[in-house]
Amino acid sequence: MWTHALSYAPAADFRFFLPAMRRLRTGPWLSWHRGATAQDVRRVVKRVRDDGPLTIRDITDDVLVDKDWLWASRKPSKLALEVAVTWGLLTVSERAGMLKTYELTDRHFGWPQPPRPATARQELAYRLDRALRAQGVVSLPSVCFHAPKLKPAVRELIEQRVRRRQLVPVDVAGVEHWATPDTLDSIPPAPDPAVVHLLSPFDPLIIQRERLERLFGYKHVFEAYVPKPKRRYGYFALPVLAGDRIVAAADLKTDRAAGKVLIQQWTPVADIVDRPAVDAALACFERFQLAAVT
């Protein structure tokens, strides 16, 4: 089961993530985990168990190493902490900006009894149901995002629900999709172009690039890792959604000293119907970015 690192997942859903966490403990290591060892993981878990919740700043006895990518830490313990989270041994109990506080999973949640891992069938149904809630209309790739091997099993479950009339086939640009009857019966009117949202590149609407392009005709590129001369939209461009169209990508930077949000680059991708609405959304975003943290 997958969610983005910057997303929230309901604690009640933890049981659906447990099977994958346990598979990671005993199966082949993920490629980005290989810089750590099982001994490293045991060491940081023991430290949290003995000393209580901690951040990477609390670990001062690491021998520093060179970074192997832009946002990596020079402290080896950082990777071990992240592996322990992926395995379900630790969780992030608090976050201040990019600084995470790590705590024992069981101690943080305080369960009277630890949740029972979902069965394979329950895990599959949860994956489909979650996609239907979030996306409304789903395809096999959108349900099986980052898990393509599950497509045959998910298709079987979908076809079973179609036979029971719990799902209805829908054609979107020649690609098979499905939706619940209630979703199709409650399709709202076209969104007002005066309703404008600045979206994160990690927003669920944006992060599945193939789905985004099919529904909106817009192909987003996250370019933080792309050399500046080769960027099209900018370092951290935010898609601008006006009504039901993406009209631009805005690469913004907050200048706190000047009390402004600067537009580093504005890339139009469609005609803007309501310019004042876009300006108002930018002003709202600026107020949010500059708001004092209490």
Regions found by a protein language model. Name each.
Residues 1-294:
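Long, charged, low-complexity, helical-prone intrinsically disordered regions
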